[in-house]
A protein has these predicted regions:
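Hydrophobic/aromatic residues in alpha-helical transmembrane segments
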Residues: 2-6, 46-47, 66, 82, ...
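Interfacial segments at transmembrane-helix termini and the short loops linking adjacent helices
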Residues: 18-19, 26, 45-73
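Membrane-water interface segments that mark the loop-to-transmembrane alpha-helix transition
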Residues: 18-40
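Residue-level recognition of transmembrane alpha-helices
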Residues: 32, 65-68, 72, 99-100, ...
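Membrane-interface helix-loop junctions in multi-pass transport and translocation proteins
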Residues: 47, 51, 93, 100-135, ...
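Membrane-interface junctions at transmembrane-helix termini in multi-pass inner-membrane proteins
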Residues: 72-98
Length: 151
């Protein structure tokens, strides 16, 4: 998040250059995609041990933690960078629309999943929504770029 915030001014200056903004994302994925997969993979592997530090009853939650890690990967790869890019190009309003749509979809999905699978259902819905929102951000950003003229 801090990198995206640091690059905000640079990306704002490039707001009418779709090629530069797409290249920014490729560079982001080359660096932070690899780092995200490696760090979240390490946490996945260490989940039972990390939770056992808090007591034996927490160790049972490793499957929930792992599900949240899958969702976090979606946030790291799509949701965060595209959300910041939308703000940088002056389209923070699109962030609001995507968040509203995801929120409205999450409510009925949780009402369905929690009675079926309990905490795993809630974790699954939240993890899926991080990926869905990231995909929506990417789609909305691409639509925005295609509407721009090339400088």
């Amino acid at each position: 998040i801090s990198v995206a915030a640091t690059d905000f001014v640079m990306n704002s200056a490039r707001k009418r250059n779709p090629f530069a903004l797409r290249n920014y994302m490729v560079g982001y994925w080359k660096t932070f995609g690899v780092l995200s997969v490696l760090s979240l993979g390490a946490l996945w592997w260490m989940a039972p041990w990390l939770l056992a530090v808090f007591g034996p009853s927490y160790a049972e939650g490793s499957s929930v933690m792992r599900l949240f890690l899958v969702g976090s990967l979606g946030a790291h790869l799509l949701r965060v960078p595209y959300g910041h890019l939308l703000s940088a190009v002056g389209r923070a309003d699109l962030n609001t629309y995507v968040n509203g749509a995801v929120f409205l979809a999450t409510i009925p999905l949780c009402f369905w999943a929690i009675p079926q699978w309990g905490i795993m259902g809630a974790a699954g819905v939240m993890a899926a929504m991080l990926w869905v929102s990231g995909g929506m951000y990417a789609l909305v950003f691409e639509i925005h770029l295609r509407g721009q003229r090339q400088d």
